[in-house]
């Protein structure tokens, strides 16, 4: 598991220290919205992923501060019956003991930067790409706004919420059935109730009954995000470099929805957290693919759910690029990739830019 053995994966020690994986476990409530995790359980059995079924008593034992009344469907705070139980109670959840979170995502990105630099990579910051240089349907490099040009026979679009713009610049969108688009997201950072040591005793919880997920944060704080229920309007952004980075009423809605589960939560008037962008596809599944322009590849559309997969996604992209540069036609005969920790081979074509929208998707950050 790459995050557990982060130093081994990097093969380099960052002067800022290394990000840490906290194996707290993760509880996913079994709800109407996720079909009581029937498909998830089958997949876990197939892949031998450890899990435990917790009944209501077990959940209350582990989360004594939780109110297990049902509030489904999730609502906005101004909607009728917001905060009122529908008369039922959550009965069970699935706990994944080997799950967890990475303590500092920004530090983990810096760790990868330093490891890449150690092997010869160079980084340019605050630079704007204005042209994807190409000749005879082959990429030849990139041109920046200041006029600098960098030649290369391979270019990978891993531009996050700017990926749509870069693909347009490269003129590779005509054959794409799946596209990307920046989506504004708000994540709440709030104090845990004083009676709860959530930092040390808490764990990741996914709760589609109230439409939020949460995890512990240092300083006995809680991070709360939306699971994108239908009531939460999507805030699409046209320009990833120019959008409103202020919190909206969504911040308070997320806090109040979580407070349905944790009545002791103090509702602060001071907004804290993160406002940023997802790079979202139509089915919230990423694009890991080649393109109609030879040598130009895509690792985009991460849709808020691919950070955890970054180490293996990088290895998969390397395999895909080698496969295509050896004159294999990935569109017709997709590359296969072995997942070493579970000894399973996957079809990389699953992530194709030319795929049909996956109807089995959650169409949310859950992927």
Predicted regions and their residues:
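Mid-domain beta-loop-alpha active-site segment that forms a flexible
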Residues: 94-114, 160-162, 209, 246-257, ...
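Dinucleotide-binding Rossmann-like beta1-alpha1 core, especially the glycine-rich loop
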Residues: 1-79, 211-212, 366
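Active-site substrate-recognition segment that forms the wall
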Residues: 4-11, 16-23, 133, 138, ...
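Charged, glycine/proline-rich intrinsically disordered loops and linkers
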Residues: 61-92, 330-340
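Helical element adjacent to the flavin cofactor pocket in flavoenzyme catalytic cores
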Residues: 80-154, 158, 165
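FAD-binding beta-loop-beta segment adjacent to the flavin cofactor pocket
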Residues: 66-68, 72-86, 267-312
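Short loop/edge segments at beta-strand edges and connector loops
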Residues: 55, 125-127, 272
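C-terminal lid/capping helical subdomain adjacent to the catalytic/cofactor pocket in oxidative enzymes
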Residues: 53, 292-367
């Amino acid at each position: 598991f790459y995050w557990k053995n982060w130093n081994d994966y990097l093969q380099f020690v960052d002067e800022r220290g290394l990000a840490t994986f906290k194996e707290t476990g993760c509880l996913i409530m079994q709800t109407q919205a996720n079909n009581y995790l029937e498909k998830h359980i089958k997949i876990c059995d197939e892949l031998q992923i450890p899990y435990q079924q917790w009944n209501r008593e077990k959940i209350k034992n582990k989360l004594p501060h939780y109110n297990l009344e049902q509030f489904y469907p999730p609502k906005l705070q101004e909607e009728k019956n917001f905060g009122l139980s529908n008369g039922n109670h959550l009965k069970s959840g699935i706990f994944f003991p080997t799950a967890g979170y990475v303590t500092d995502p920004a530090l983990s990105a810096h760790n990868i930067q330093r490891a890449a630099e150690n092997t010869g990579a160079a980084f340019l910051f605050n630079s704007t790409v204005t042209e994807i240089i190409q000749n005879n349907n082959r990429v030849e490099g990139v041109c920046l706004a200041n006029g600098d040009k960098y030649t290369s026979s391979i270019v990978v679009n891993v531009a996050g919420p700017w990926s749509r713009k870069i693909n347009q610049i490269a003129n590779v969108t005509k054959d794409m059935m799946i596209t990307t688009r920046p989506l504004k997201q708000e994540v709440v950072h709030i104090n845990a109730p004083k009676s709860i040591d959530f930092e040390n005793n808490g764990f990741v919880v996914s709760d589609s009954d109230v439409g939020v997920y949460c995890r512990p944060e240092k300083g006995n704080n809680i991070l709360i995000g939306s699971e994108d229920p239908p009531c939460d309007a999507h805030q699409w952004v046209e320009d990833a470099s120019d959008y409103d980075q202020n919190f909206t009423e969504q911040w308070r809605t997320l806090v109040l929805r979580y407070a349905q589960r944790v009545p002791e939560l103090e509702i602060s008037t001071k907004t804290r957290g993160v406002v940023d962008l997802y790079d979202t596809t139509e089915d919230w599944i990423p694009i890991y693919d080649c393109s109609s322009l030879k040598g130009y590849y895509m690792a985009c559309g991460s849709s808020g759910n691919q950070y955890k997969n970054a180490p293996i996604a990088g290895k998969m992209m390397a395999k895909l690029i080698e496969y295509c540069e050896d004159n294999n036609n990935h569109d017709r005969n997709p590359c296969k990739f072995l997942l070493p920790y579970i000894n399973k081979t996957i079809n990389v074509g699953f992530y194709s830019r030319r795929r049909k929208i996956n109807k089995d998707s959650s169409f949310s950050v859950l992927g």
